C-alpha cells in the first residue's frame, strides 16, 4: 500500500507542474455572427435601431375587440356582432373546441375513445384511446 501511494504523489506533482494552455476562444462579436447567418444586407437591417415613431405607425389607432377567447359561447357570439369580428371559420372552430374540451370521462362510456370507436385486433370494441 505504501509503495502505491509513494508513486502516486510524484505523478500528481508532475501533472501540477505541466503548464496547460487553453485553446483560443472562438467568440465572435454579434455583427460577425449576424453577417454569417443572414448575409450583409439583412444583418444591416436587423442591427439598425428602431424608431418609436415607426412602431407607432404600425399600431392601430383605435382599440380593437377584446382578445380573450373564453370557453363561454357568449364571449364567442360577442365577437361575431362586432364590425371587426374574426372570420366565421375561426369562430366555428373555437366553438367546436370549447364543446370538445367540456367532455369528461362520462362521455367515453360505451366504447368511445378520444378519436371515436376503437376496435382491437380481435374485434372487440374498447374505449382505451387516450
Swiss-Prot record:
One of its GO terms (biological process) is receptor guanylyl cyclase signaling pathway. It is found in: Secreted. Its main location: secreted. One of its GO terms (molecular function) is hormone activity. Exhibits natriuretic and vasodepressant activity. Has cGMP-stimulating activity. May help to regulate body fluid homeostasis in a variety of aquatic environments. Belongs to the natriuretic peptide family. This is C-type natriuretic peptide 2. It comes from Takifugu rubripes.
Amino acid at each position: 500500500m505504501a509503495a502505491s501511494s509513494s508513486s502516486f504523489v510524484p505523478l500528481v506533482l508532475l501533472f501540477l507542474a505541466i503548464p496547460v494552455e487553453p485553446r483560443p476562444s472562438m467568440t465572435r462579436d454579434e455583427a460577425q455572427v449576424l453577417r454569417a447567418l443572414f448575409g450583409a444586407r439583412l444583418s444591416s437591417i436587423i442591427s439598425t435601431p428602431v424608431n418609436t415613431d415607426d412602431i407607432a405607425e404600425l399600431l392601430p389607432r383605435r382599440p380593437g375587440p377584446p382578445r380573450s377567447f373564453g370557453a363561454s359561447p357568449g364571449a364567442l357570439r360577442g365577437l361575431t356582432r362586432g364590425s371587426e369580428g374574426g372570420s366565421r371559420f375561426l369562430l366555428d372552430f373555437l366553438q367546436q373546441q370549447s364543446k370538445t374540451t367540456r367532455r369528461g370521462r362520462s362521455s367515453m362510456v360505451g366504447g368511445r375513445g378520444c378519436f371515436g370507436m376503437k376496435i382491437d385486433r380481435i374485434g372487440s370494441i374498447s374505449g382505451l384511446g387516450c
